[in-house]
């Protein structure tokens, strides 16, 4: 299975996309045109930053991806994020990796930031478990409700 197929398992699922595209799943063409270039760029840059595929250790089952990228808004900050297939929600994977990513970024001397729609209580809880603290509420132009920024 190719990378676009794996990503389509996430982006083609309305439940996974609920707090990203207001629940509108992406088509395979949209995955190839919009999602893949961003992910492939992180591999081509060959840095410690990017969006990285996540697999279960015991089975090599693809479960989603994790983000560890230089933040575009705050200098010397790293944004963390995650997108998991819904059958892997609630297993602690997002929290486990978020904690590791926070520790890695802090060792690099960076501030860690994460963002989520205010209704995305599961992601907000992951941020809190990873030690991030509420910083502010803000609005993206395309959003129907506010987002929140957490920092550590």
Each model region followed by its residue ranges:
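A short linear-motif detector with a strong N-terminal bias
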Residues: 30-34, 47, 92, 128-131
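Short, basic and Ser/Thr-rich N-terminal targeting/leader segments
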Residues: 47-48, 62
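Acyl-donor (CoA/ACP) binding surface of acyl/acetyltransferases
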Residues: 1-6, 10-18, 53-152
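Short solvent-exposed loop/turn micro-motifs enriched in small/polar/acidic residues
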Residues: 45-47, 143
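Conserved GNAT-fold acetyl-CoA-binding loop/helix
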Residues: 15-39, 48-50
